[in-house]
């Protein structure tokens, strides 16, 4: 998982927690982590970067907040140059994942993230918390654009259980509609 950036510090002008994947996990723990039932700790930013990496043919970019700085006369003072941080997967793997993520949204657990006129690829996630005080942790990560081969947005939506999430809530039923609203607003710009 280190090839995806887990365990690495992110250098952006905001406090950001490091996403971690436990070292030396046994195969059983690794399998459980794959369904959200182990000790993986990640942030929405990291998961948006994972989705963006798939969208970007396997290249993970260094995240940044400001693309351009303008002066008082609206002249460009500086421009951020996109930089590749790492390449955790090859373009063929990224293309396969893109197809699978498109299927998840078109006919799988992520149908609630569909947006009219927009191609959306995504993956839902649901993890029980082991608590009786609310619903599960629900996720949707994905990317979208009017052309899926040239996406314009990557998203990660997470709702951390609690009383407002029904105990039957899932990534598709809770996080997916929020992702659809974000994608619709961003692609509509």
Give the location of each predicted region.
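A short acidic/glycine-rich loop-to-helix N-cap element
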Residues: 159-174
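Generic non-transmembrane alpha-helical segments
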Residues: 100, 165, 181-185
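Short, gly/Ser/Thr-rich active-site loops of penicillin-recognizing serine hydrolases
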Residues: 76-83, 173-189
């Amino acid at each position: 998982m280190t090839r995806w950036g887990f365990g690495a510090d992110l250098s952006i002008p905001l406090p950001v927690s490091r996403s971690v994947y436990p070292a030396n996990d046994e195969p059983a723990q690794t399998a459980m982590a794959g369904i959200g039932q182990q000790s993986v700790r990640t942030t929405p930013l990291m998961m948006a970067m994972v989705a963006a990496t798939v969208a970007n043919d396997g290249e993970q970019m260094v995240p940044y907040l400001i693309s351009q700085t303008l002066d008082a006369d609206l002249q460009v003072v500086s421009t951020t140059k996109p930089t590749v941080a790492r390449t955790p997967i090859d373009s063929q793997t990224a293309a396969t994942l893109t197809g699978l993520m498109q299927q998840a949204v078109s006919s799988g657990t992520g149908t609630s993230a569909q947006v009219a006129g927009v191609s959306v690829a995504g993956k839902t996630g649901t993890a029980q918390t082991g608590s009786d005080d609310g619903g599960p942790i629900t996720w949707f990560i994905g990317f979208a654009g009017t052309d899926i081969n040239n996406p314009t947005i990557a998203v990660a939506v997470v709702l951390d259980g609690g009383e407002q999430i029904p105990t039957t809530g899932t990534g598709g039923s809770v996080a997916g509609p929020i992702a659809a609203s974000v994608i619709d607003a961003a692609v509509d710009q």
